[in-house]
Amino acid sequence: MVKIIQWIRKSKSSMKLTDKCFNKVKKNCLKFIKSQETKADKFKNKERMIKSFLIPLCFWISKKADKKRPYFVGLAGGQGTGKTTISSLIKIILTKYFDLKVFRISIDDFYKTRKERKSLSKIWCL
């Protein structure tokens, strides 16, 4: 994958593709990023991150993906490292530019607090 990202960064034709993709997804990506920022915690180098990392990654994913079968991509990292944010941005790019159907799921969608788990266990133990 590193070689693909390097190729995309160096190739003039791929730079044009990257720019074309960026122009199409920029508004949606920046709007999403803005919704995630707080006054104290602003994202740095937003456009650079999208153009230099996310778009090349999405080109790689799109080459691997088959519209007829599911293709799974996983992101791992500790709490608060940006997995949900990055996966949301990848989804925006893959759906808006590459016209792929994307289903994003987060482990946070399944997480319950200790109190919630205890409550649920009481219901199931009755």
Where do the language-model regions lie?
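Conserved nucleotide-sensing/catalytic segment adjacent to the nucleotide-binding pocket
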Residues: 41-47, 103-106, 110-126
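ATP-binding Walker
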Residues: 81
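Post-Walker A helix-loop "phosphate-sensing" segment adjacent to the P-loop in P-loop NTPases
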Residues: 92-103
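Charged, amphipathic alpha-helical linker segments immediately N-terminal to NTP-binding catalytic cores
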Residues: 1-52
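Hydrophobic anchor at the beta1->P-loop junction of P-loop NTPases
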Residues: 73-75
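Walker A/P-loop
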Residues: 84
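Phosphate-binding P-loop
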Residues: 63-70
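P-loop (Walker A) phosphate-binding loop of NTP-binding proteins
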Residues: 78
